[in-house]
Amino acid sequence: MITHDPQLLALRALTAPLLGTEEPLTHLNEISLSAQGAAVCGHVLIDLLEENDLAIGDYEVVIAPEGDGALAAAMIHAAGGRGLDLDAALLRPTQATASDASFTGAPIHGRPAVLLANSSLVDTGALREAVEAAGATVVGVISLLPDPSTQDFARESGLTYCAPSLAD
């Protein structure tokens, strides 16, 4: 897909080296924990949600596994740069059931949420179940790195799925 969006072009340039690796997720923190990368990632993720009719306000909190905390923080900062409020919560790893899940960060009970899921290693269904057991309502799913299993989950659940097109 051809684009002239400077944020998406910058993201493509940043992710190009890691997309050629066998384990792109292991290198994702190299991008999301850099000043330039965090700014670009946060704006691209929020823009994608807006392009799919999910504006901040339609969701109040982004919820992610602990490993995606840097991306959740990037979204908070991008929202703040736009004069908008966005909170985040992280799911702590657990071996227990969804009803025993533990979150750190902003309160999620009674709030509309977007799930940030970047890996087929994350069971998006279990993440959603834990979020809903904690009282939040999931309104969409977003990934920085496109993931077919997460996309399938979102489609089967009737949720909006967003991921950037990282190919030229």
Task: Enumerate the language-model features and the residues they cover.
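PRPP-associated nucleotide enzymes
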Residues: 1-168
